[in-house]
A protein has these predicted regions:
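Acidic, small-polar-rich N-terminal luminal/periplasmic segments of exported/outer-membrane proteins
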Residues: 24-140
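Short sequence motifs at beta-strands and strand-loop junctions characteristic
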Residues: 113, 122-124, 150-153, 190-195, ...
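Outer-membrane beta-barrel pore domains and translocons
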Residues: 116, 133, 146-150, 176-178, ...
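Transmembrane beta-strands of outer-membrane beta-barrel proteins
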Residues: 141-145, 171-173, 211-215, 302-306, ...
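Transmembrane beta-barrel wall of Gram-negative outer-membrane proteins
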Residues: 142, 149-180, 184-255, 280, ...
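Face-selective signature of the C-terminal outer-membrane beta-barrel domain
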Residues: 283-312, 342-456
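Outer-membrane beta-barrel proteins
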Residues: 156, 180-186, 222-228, 302, ...
Length: 456
């Protein structure tokens, strides 16, 4: 039995925007200590190949400590692509966010970084990409436990248990729990990021270790209102620095309005509805994956990976702002109690994104080392279905911690009388609302020849 606590960290002055760096390949000591056994199962070729590469670093995004850093290189790619067992962790992060379904947690055996050229050949995406591999298990029992906390009250629990069943079966089970209240209190919820992800898997060893086939299940459930809460007013000094606005401390004060709901016009139904701030950031998905490989006697290595993922809720909220100005009572802005307001205000914009996502992905490759040439032929068949719409509205708020929403005279275009009435929201769906329902299919064949000209 080998139970090992992998990581324990207590941050005394941590912010949610702190970036971390992972040095790769990961778990190097553990992998070296178990190389003999891996060879007997023929499961080691991926880690061996990665050890031969120069080390590459994967840095987490400075704006989000739960996903890789987005690196813009001036070529068409929507964001950083993350692959899990040779397939996209999420097909597109524009609706179903990567951090809602994938974390660099204890369920992973290791990670690697693909260059734009490698990613372009294998996937068609021209971008730096993170390639991750699941922990499948080994003959002996192993446990990995990571725990992180900070003085704001964040706690993160990350556990993996794996081992063997009999001679030819392996198992793995993982649990990821994140309780992050953020660096300031959100009055409408307890956590800026409440994410839970579970993994379960069984692996069958084939033909005395020449191959394996694994069935993996994943469930993710994430609520991340911190995605729209990370905003703050400031004064731009003109030299690249900012100055604080009196009474507001960026990063420590909340710029999310104090009341818990808004009226908006639903793009899909055409009706006025109420958005409660506790809703709108929910994501949950179920995924089942089949990953396999087999080493033939003639030297050819065949890999076949496939998965189906269904996310019936893939929602998020965007906030935007504009310039800050000062108004007087004569400008007609009122607080919720009907009193006239004078002082600083900012025009705010809000987008509500509601989506349902599903995809079926398959990738197969066959490769062989021929002298100083490594040949590989691959096939991708990726299907993606999206049912998505967004609604937008505008509002004006005070410039202070927990802003108050201000009402003003507004003519609702849906009002047949076209009478001006006092309203806290306006400009319904004037800011790029969208409705999309459809599917996309990608079929690709690729061939590579990695020619090592000299032994060095």
């Amino acid at each position: 039995m080998n139970l090992k606590i992998r990581t324990f960290s207590m941050a005394l002055a941590a912010m949610s925007a702190t970036s971390y760096m992972y040095a790769l390949p990961s778990n190097n000591i553990e992998e070296k200590s178990s190389t003999k056994e891996k060879k007997s199962l023929n499961l080691e070729e991926e880690s061996v190949e990665k050890n031969k590469k120069e080390e590459r670093n994967v840095m987490l995004n400075a704006a989000d400590a739960n996903k890789p850093r987005e690196i813009q290189i001036g070529l068409p790619s929507e964001d950083v692509t993350v692959y899990e067992n040779g397939l996209p962790a999420v097909y597109s992060s524009s609706v179903h966010k990567l951090s809602a379904h994938w974390r660099g947690d204890a369920s992973l055996k290791g990670t690697d970084l693909m260059t734009p050229s490698e990613s372009a050949i294998a996937t068609g995406n021209i971008a730096y990409a993170v390639s991750s591999f699941s922990e499948l298990g080994q003959k002996e029992f192993k446990g990995k436990l990571n725990y992180k906390a900070n003085h704001f009250g964040m706690q993160n629990f990350d556990l993996n248990l794996s081992g063997g069943i009999g001679t030819n079966w392996l198992y793995t089970a993982s649990m990821y729990q994140n309780f992050d209240p953020g660096s300031f209190k959100l009055r409408f919820t307890d956590y800026a990021d409440r994410t839970q992800i579970y993994h379960f898997g069984l692996t069958r060893i084939l033909n005395e270790g020449k191959g394996r086939i694994s069935l993996l299940y994943k469930y993710s459930n994430s609520k991340n209102p911190g995605n729209f809460a990370n905003a703050a007013p400031f004064i731009y000094a003109g030299d690249g620095s900012i100055k604080k606005i009196a009474g507001f401390d960026p990063g420590m004060n909340s710029y999310v309005q104090r009341q818990g709901s808004f009226q908006y016009l639903n793009t899909k139904t055409g009706k006025m509805e109420t958005w409660n701030m506790t809703d709108g950031s929910e994501n949950h998905a179920n995924e089942i994956a089949l990953i396999s490989q087999y080493q033939f006697d003639n030297g050819w290595l065949w890999k076949f990976n496939a998965k189906y993922m269904n996310a019936p809720r893939a929602n998020y909220v965007d906030y935007g702002g504009s310039s800050i100005s000062e108004v007087s009572e004569a400008d007609g802005y009122q607080l919720s109690d009907g009193s006239a307001y004078s002082g600083l205000i900012e025009g705010r914009r809000t987008w509500l994104h509601i989506g349902k996502v599903s995809n079926a992905l398959m990738t197969t490759e066959i490769s062989k080392q021929l002298n100083n040439h490594k040949l590989m032929i691959g096939l991708n068949e990726w299907y993606y279905h999206l049912d998505y719409y967004s609604s937008s509205f505008q509002w004006a708020g005070t410039v202070e911690p927990y802003p108050r929403t201000l009402s003003q005279m507004y003519v609702n275009p849906l009002d047949p009388t076209q009478t001006a009435r006092r309203s806290e929201t306006f400009g319904y769906n004037e800011l790029s609302p969208e409705y999309t329902k459809g599917s996309e299919n990608k079929l690709a064949v690729y061939f590579t020849d990695e020619w090592k000209v000299t032994p060095k």
